[in-house]
């Protein structure tokens, strides 16, 4: 399987990756090589856990207002 990933570099110099099609699947590393290894592992673990967990019952979508400033 192939997955699109989004890579960013944070203010501490770490590379951070997320997998948009797998909510909550993300990792970080100091180098791009290490990041690619870690994201593959994160995806594998995500898929392994997902197949062993039943999907919850969809309840709905709500809008929440938060005041800032």
From Swiss-Prot:
Domain of life, per lineage: Archaea
InterPro entries per the UniProt record, alphabetical: HicB-like, TA_system_antitoxin, TTHA1013/TTHA0281-like
Name one matching Pfam family.
HicB_lk_antitox
- Protein family (similarity comment): Belongs to the UPF0150 family.
What is the protein name given in its UniProt record?
UPF0150 protein AF_1072
Q: Which organism is it from?
A: Archaeoglobus fulgidus (strain ATCC 49558 / DSM 4304 / JCM 9628 / NBRC 100126 / VC-16)
Top-level taxonomy: Archaea, Methanobacteriati, Methanobacteriota, Archaeoglobi, Archaeoglobales
């Amino acid at each position: 399987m192939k997955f699109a990933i989004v890579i960013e570099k944070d203010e501490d110099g770490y590379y951070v990756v997320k997998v948009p099609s797998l909510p909550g699947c993300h990792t970080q590393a100091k180098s791009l090589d290490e990041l690619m290894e870690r994201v593959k592992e994160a995806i594998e673990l995500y898929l392994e856990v997902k197949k062993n967990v039943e999907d919850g019952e969809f309840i709905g979508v709500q809008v929440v207002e938060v005041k800032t400033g």
